[in-house]
Amino acid sequence: MDKAFDEIIGNSHTDSSSNHKVTRYRRRDLRNELGPRLGFAPSDAASRSKDRLYREREEPPLPKRIRISKIPLDVSDYTLDDMIKEFGSPIFSKIFDNKEDRTCIYEFEDPEVLEKIVERYNGHELHNAKIEVEIYQPQRKHSRMNAHNRRKQTAQEQGRGRPGSHYRQRPNRVSKKNKGREKNNTPTSVEALDAELDAYMKG
């Protein structure tokens, strides 16, 4: 009889366990999208950042250019064109006028021309002023934006105060009411106390 009772209990337990469905939950850190930051799965932001870095590495650098600066304002564009004409026709040229001087940018198909221009005109005197000629590597727009964003982020972090604080600490301000209370709470002079004591004694 005991054996039969055990079989009945066992069968009922088996039936209940077979009918019971086990609900599987995702890990909470994955549900809350904390998994990528903990190293369980790649995040979209990290993937985009990596893709951008790969694109920047795959993109070839821009051709080098020549920059002529500290040109007097009274030097005409035709004079500058005549100076460069002997080295060939540039494929890119741009002139910037500032308050004090002018600056020219040139790009040539043959990069060897740049060295010749530097040797020829660096320190050259033009209208009683010495001009400067140098070769530089231009940057792409997204590279300049990334550098600007990094500088901006650094400035914001420095303006927040000490690490761990969300806002910059502000000096304690005393309201007008508190100021009035402070004035009323100031101790009176000895003469005033004596006068009050005399009035009290006479009364």
From Swiss-Prot:
Residues 47-60 have a biased composition (Basic and acidic residues). It is found in: Nucleus. It comes from the Eukaryota. GO terms for molecular function: DNA binding; RNA binding. SMART domains: RRM. The modification N-acetylmethionine is found at residue 1. Residues 64-138 form the RRM domain. CDD domains: RRM_YRA2. GO terms for cellular component: nucleus. Keywords: Acetylation, DNA-binding, mRNA transport, Nucleus, RNA-binding, Transport. Residues 139-153, 163-180 have a biased composition (Basic residues). Associates with mRNPs. Interacts with YRA1. Involved in export of poly(A) mRNAs from the nucleus. Recruited to the coding sequences as well as poly-A sites of active genes. This is RNA annealing protein YRA2. It comes from Saccharomyces cerevisiae (strain RM11-1a) (Baker's yeast).
